[in-house]
Structure formats: C-alpha cells, structure tokens
Amino acid sequence: MQVGRYEILEIIGTGAHGRVARSHDPLIGRLVAIKLFPKELASGAARQRFLQEARVVGQLSHPSIITLHDMGIDEATQTPYLVMEFLEGQPLDRILEKGSIPFSRASAWAAELASALGVAHRKGVIHGDVKPANVLITDDGRVKLMDFGMARLASRDSAATPLVGTPAYWCPEQIMGKPQDARSDLFSLGVVLHEMVTGQRPFDADSLQGICGRVLSSTPLPPSHANPSLPTGFDEVVSRCLAKDPSARYATAEALAQDLYPLARRKVIPQAPPQTNGNGLRDRAARLLRSA
C-alpha cells in the first residue's frame, strides 16, 4: 500500500482519530510514522481546515514534540495524512499499566511536557487531548508529546467540539462546553502528573457521568496521600494544575515547568515504615550489642 510517495509497511496503532503506520520514505531513505485520517476530512471546508491546522502544527519545534515532516491528501484514495518522525518506544499509558513511576523521572517528564506545551501555546496551538496515550517514552528515555491539535483536526464539525478526548483527563470547562485555552492543557497535564506518581487517576469513576461529576465538584486527595515520600511542595503544584477555576491554575506552561524542574532534581528520601510498638527499637539495640 502506498500513500503519497510513502510506502506503508505496517499499521502500528489505531485510535479515535485514525490509524498510525510504520512507513518508508523512498526519497530520503528513512522510516517515518504516518497518521491516516478519515476520508471525510478531504472534502469541502474540512479539507482546507485540515491543511491549515496541519501547517500550524508543523511549525512547532521542541525536543519533546514529535516532529511533523510532511502532510497531504492522497490523490488515489483521498486519505488525509501526516508524516512524522518514527521513534521506538512505548506510550505512557502502557507504562502506567505496570504502576506508578519514580518521582524524579515522572516530574522531569512532566517538566519537559510543560515546556513543550509552552512552545505550542505561544504559537496559538492548544493540544486539547493531553493524556498518557498521547505521550511517547522512547527507548532511550526521552519524552515526546504526540497528536498536537489532532482532536480538533479529526472533528468533522468545523466548530469547536467540547467533548473530544478521554473523559478522565477532561477539564471542567471542556465538560461544560466553555471555551478552552492554554490552562485547559495544564489541567490535563496535572491529571497525568498525579497518575504518574501515584498510579491512580484523580477523577476516576465507573461511568462517564461519574467521571464528569468528580471533575466538576470533587477535590482529589493530594498525591502524597498515596505516596508519602513525595517532596514538600509537590502537592501544591498538582493542586494548582487541577484548580476548577482556570484563573487559579498556572497562567502559563512555562511557569509550571519552572516549578517542576527544581523538584525533579530534588532527592526523594523514602520514609521508614512506622513502628507499631517498641519491638523494632529493642531489636535494633540487640543487634548493636551482638556486633560490639
């Protein structure tokens, strides 16, 4: 199968917004990843909107943003596509299936993601779907944010669509159908950060209605409740990201990154398990006497 000049080698992922294929660029002789979108995006006003927004996304340059190489609409099949750098790695959601992530690594990744979002926001690009499935961790430990603007690109309606993405990472204004801005992405990143260090989503529930209700009205337990070894100040960072009122969140992604980078470099000292009686102290004293 061929799309444009690119040879499709295999489909490596399928999601709500399309399919991703490992592909070969014969002109340059390199592997690339191609995202294939529904054909509906190639007709009418949707076609022009797809091309315009893809051009904006293609201007984003940051070490933690997947690089967009090319875009087009295949003449033979009328399939819209984006051509991106191909990287070996795993999506963050698959890594989180194994449990929480060490704090220093999680906070460093989150700081890089915040820095990447800052670059996009300055260009007027809102991600709109920040979640672990859209974060790639490469085999050499780098973090890459994927699918910038893809939630809007994949919408068949030219108007803003309030409910796209994954409910557990929606912000309150998204649920209420209000306008979203850069601070909406920071709410979603706060959910991801909470999940990375605790292994738990802060607004999880058994139903869509339950999740939305929690996002709108509940205050989650601080991350330190599940992970007491977290450094002082981290709970406040997450709490600020998850504020219901956007004006109470970080004003910019750069401000969030500036708070996260120092925390990522801070050593985490695991707390000793609490002693329920005096036996632990007596046992330690006995060992010291025996070794004397």
Residue locations for each model-derived region?
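Conserved short submotifs of the Hanks-type protein kinase catalytic core
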Residues: 77-91
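Conserved N-lobe ATP-binding subsite of Hanks-type protein kinase domains
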Residues: 19
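AlphaC helix of the eukaryotic protein kinase fold
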Residues: 38-59
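Activation segment signature within eukaryotic-like protein kinase domains
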Residues: 109-110
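Protein kinase catalytic-loop region centered on the HRD/HxD motif
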Residues: 115-125
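Activation-segment/catalytic-loop signature of the eukaryotic protein kinase fold
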Residues: 71
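C-terminal lobe helix-coil module of Hanks-type protein kinase domains
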Residues: 117, 166-272
